[in-house]
Amino acid sequence: MARSKRVPLLILCAVVMQPAFSASLDELAGTERAAVLRTAAEPVTEVQQKNPRPRLLPRHGELERLVADIQSSLEPNLFVETLSLYQKPRAADWDNVEQINLLNQLTALSTLAGIQYYSESRKTMRTFYETSAVIDSPAKKTPLPDPVYAALPNSLLLYARQKDLTFGDNIYSFNFYTGEDYIFFVQENLTAMNAGIIPAIGKNKLHSLVAVIDSGDSLLIYAAAMAKTASVPGMGDRIGHSFTNRAKAILKWFTERAGGVF
C-alpha cells in the first residue's frame, strides 16, 4: 500500500515542477511569419496611418484584448509595429525565477538612459533618452531607485520621467501585466509631447507597448506604438519613421537586459 501511495505523489510533483504551457511560435505568429522570424536579421516592421489596424499582432488572447482596448479608447491615426525573436539558451525554462528576474530587468527604467536609435532626419545614430528615472508620482516627480520584486505581481504601475532629445522632458506611466506565458508593459505619455516648438502628440495620446511571450525555445517580442498625432502636414510620416527606429532601439535594449537573465 505504501508504494501505491507514493506513485501519485511523484506524479503530482512532476506535474508541479513542469514549466507553464506555452504556445509554439507557429501558433503565435503563423507558419509563414514564424519562418521569416527564425531567419530575419532585422525585426519585421509595419507602419500605418489614418485608419490603422494591427498586422503583426501575435495570436495571444490577453495581448489581443489589450491592443483592442487601447485602439478603442485612443482611436490612433498612427500605428507602428515591430516583431522579433529572442532565442533562449537551451537551459532556459521560463520558470518563475526567470520570469521575476526578467520583470526586474524591464522595470529597471534607469537603464534606458543613453540608448541609441537611428535618426532618419539626421542620417546618424542619436541618443533616445538622455535621462530616465522612476519617480514617486506625476505631481512630485521625486526620483526613486529602480524597483526590485521578489514575487511576480499580476500587474503593477510605475511612473517615470524621461528626457527625450526629440520630444523633450516628459512624464509617463508604465503599466506592467504578467501571466503564465507573458510579460507586457504599456507606456503612456502623461504630458504633451512637442518636437521643438511644434505640437506632436497630446497628453495621453501615445501608448507604446512591449509584449514578451514565451514560445518554447524562444521569446516572441511584439512592440507597438499607437498614437493620435497632431494634424500638422508631414508630422505623421516623421513620427512614423522615428518610432520605427525607436522600437528597434527598445528591442536591442530588451535583448541586452534578457541576456542577464537567461
Please identify what each model-predicted range represents.
Residues 158, 166-167, 171-209:
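Hydrophobic-ligand binding "helix-grip"
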Residues 1-9:
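Bacterial N-terminal signal peptides that target proteins for export
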Residues 23-165:
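Hydrophobic ligand-binding cavity/cleft-lining segments
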